[in-house]
From Swiss-Prot:
It comes from Rickettsia massiliae (strain Mtu5). Disulfide bonds join C108-C204. The active site is at C108 (nucleophile), C204 (cysteine persulfide intermediate). The record marks H133, Q344 as: Interaction with tRNA. This is tRNA-specific 2-thiouridylase MnmA. One of its GO terms (molecular function) is tRNA-uridine 2-sulfurtransferase activity.
Length: 365
């Protein structure tokens, strides 16, 4: 059993209705803490009722309530639909219209699940907020530090890089040292019906993976056709709207050529999709913005050798970073990397520790 090392406390658990957060609630309850379950309804209930593997709506709210009832803990469902739409869905749509590849789960963790939920937990008089994320918080010489989960297959640190130092002090991640199988065994031990429940999908508000329908619903007539141009400057055809393309895409381009072509750049201002050979995807350096830094301050003109991840599914790559003003950094790979997509996150590591991260901009070379 994982013990948080805290004295008996009042702890709010963010309960999504899945096995992870349910196991956290049961674990903390058994340890004698005063546990309060909170579930956020984040998007249209009607959309979610018939959707498998969603989260934060429909069946999942019911499952969270059933777990809370079994444990005998108070449980509240909070309507966060308007906050979620404003902070996450609208940003998701606007990012695609700007030719970016958005990362809504990070936006949700930053604005809704942490910022707003921590505020609610404090208002309830809670000492801490616990979640089912697979990351670790370790107390260092200068306060709380964020580390990867011990199970590489479930590590979620990439999605939590925007967590602030102040938030880290308040948060608890009881599952950071466990594997998914160990979590399911814990849930079975506690007799929770969700022990074998499948994991939710990444983008909870996109039915059947059709993000274009979400964009067209919120921004009608957003799929304006335009030119597809080769990186060497000649026109190859027409596209059906930049929302249908992402950096590194090969399939579905609808053009014939004598070698495989990939999307290498999207220009929202002139509504142009640029394509080229695989070699054109190589990127040596780029700029990140809105940097959240969790380690010791980097001095101006100081260069730091680190590992970075530019996609959640990619392994870390060696790079050199340097500070550019208050909220920007330059990232330079030791070896060129393919398909660096504006709108995605670049998360910076020193071993298993998360040093910080930021959002990839169009300043790519």
């Amino acid at each position: 059993m994982i013990n948080l090392g805290d004295k008996q406390s009042t702890i709010v658990v963010a309960m999504s209705g899945g096995v992870d957060s349910s196991a956290v609630a049961a674990m903390l309850h058994e340890q004698g803490h005063n546990v309060i379950g909170i579930t956020l309804q984040l998007y249209d209930h009607g959309m979610a009722v018939g959707k498998k593997n969603a989260c934060c709506a429909g069946q999942d709210i019911y499952d969270a309530k059933m777990v809370a009832n079994k444990l005998g803990i108070p449980h509240y469902v909070l309507d966060y639909e308007s906050k979620f739409k404003e902070s996450v869905i609208d940003n998701f749509v606007d990012s695609y219209l700007q030719g970016e590849t958005p990362l809504p789960c990070v936006r949700c963790n930053k604005s809704v699940k942490f910022r707003d939920l921590i505020k609610t937990a404090r208002e309830l008089g809670a000492d801490k907020l616990a979640t089912g994320h697979y990351v670790r918080k370790i107390n260092g010489d200068n306060g709380a530090e964020l580390y990867t989960g011990l199970d590489p297959a479930k590590d979620q640190s990439y999605f939590l890089f925007t967590t602030t130092k102040e938030q880290l002090e308040y948060l608890r991640f009881p599952l950071g040292g466990l594997t998914k199988d160990e979590t399911r065994k814990l849930a079975s031990k506690f007799g929770l019906e969700v022990a074998d429940k499948p994991d939710s999908q990444d983008i909870c508000f996109v039915p059947d993976g059709n993000y274009k329908s979400v964009i067209n619903k919120i921004r009608p007539n957003s799929s304006e056709s335009g030119k597809i141009i080769h990186v060497n400057g000649f026109k190859l055809g027409e596209h059906s709207g930049i929302i249908n393309y992402t950096i590194g895409q090969r399939r579905g381009l609808g053009i014939a050529y004598n070698e495989p072509l990939y999307v290498v750049k999207i220009d929202p201002k002139d509504n142009i999709v640029y394509v080229g050979p695989e070699s054109a995807l190589n990127v040596q350096e780029f700029i990140i913005r809105d940097v959240n830094w969790l380690a010791d301050e980097i001095k101006d003109n100081e260069k730091l050798e680190v590992a970075v991840k530019i996609r959640s599914t990619r392994p870390p790559r060696l790079a050199e970073i340097s500070k550019l003003g208050d909220d920007k950094m330059k990232v330079k790979f030791l070896c060129a990397e393919k398909a660096v997509a504006p709108g995605q996150a670049c998360v910076i590591y020193a071993g298993e520790r998360v040093l910080g991260g930021g959002w990839i901009t169009r300043e790519i070379r």
